[in-house]
Amino acid sequence: NKGVELSLSTINVKTRDFTWQTDWTFSTNSEKIKELANGSMQDTSGPWFVGHPINIFWDYKYDRIWQDTLEDNKMMQLYQKIGNLTFLPGQYKICDQPLEEVPEGTEGSKTVILDDGTKVSYMDNGFGRFTDDDKVIYNKSPKWTGGLNNSFTYKDWNFSFFTYFRFGNTYYGLSQTIGRRLEKDVWSPTNTNAKFAQPTTATRTSTYDGARNYTKGNMVLVRNIALSYTVPQKFLNKYGI
């Protein structure tokens, strides 16, 4: 576990009545598992992997939305024939091993017959079914965080605000697929570049839809906005305060 923390204060402008001061902070942290019990390189119950951080997600990766095209319909049939998986146009597609089509009879290949009688021979590299080999590692912790506080003082008035930065992490948000209000940008035959899947009650494989919920946690947030006034001491003295 290694990290760096830096802080810096600067006075950008200073006159008789006006001062602008900025306080900067920056931190980065890198953690990696060096070894696991019994010399293992991974423990999926954690999940923990040598060479990777402790605080991670280990899951499938969202690819795109299935389209109603010849190519995608062929792929969806292959998933049905190979892995008994039912996918539909307008639903979420998950990253898998690549489809490698080869001549029939190629060593290490398999052959399936599509509904129209077409034969498809492919390398048996894991395509068509989802296993641990298809999962990826998502880092929950940001690669770096930072902030800056700007303070502006004019005579007895002060205005300040704090800006927070965070980059390089992934979070899991259920609002992408569960409990979300009806979105306008959902897939349809006339809106094929939509961000969200088409609502449906059709029978399909939805086991892997959760992969859509992983989202980059990069953010810039302005908070702690404050405006204050300092009552002059002579005024307080005058009224005995």
Per-range role (PLM):
Residues T22-T28, F152, F161-F165, P189, ...:
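Transmembrane beta-barrel strands of outer-membrane/channel proteins
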Residues K2-L8, W144-N150, V222-L227:
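Hydrophobic, lipid-facing positions within transmembrane beta-strands of outer-membrane proteins
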Residues V4, I11-Y138:
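Conserved small-residue
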Residues W20-T22, L148, Y154, F159-F161, ...:
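Transmembrane beta-strands of outer-membrane beta-barrel proteins
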Residues V4, R16, D156-F161, K234-F235:
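Repeated loop/turn-to-beta-strand initiation elements of outer-membrane beta-barrel proteins
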Residues T10-N12, F26-K32, Y154-D156, F165-N169, ...:
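Transmembrane beta-strands of outer-membrane beta-barrel pores
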Residues R166-I241:
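Extracytoplasmic gating/loop element in the C-terminal half of outer-membrane beta-barrel translocons
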Residues S7-S9, F127-V136, K140, K195, ...:
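Extracytoplasmic loops and strand-loop junctions of Gram-negative outer membrane beta-barrel proteins
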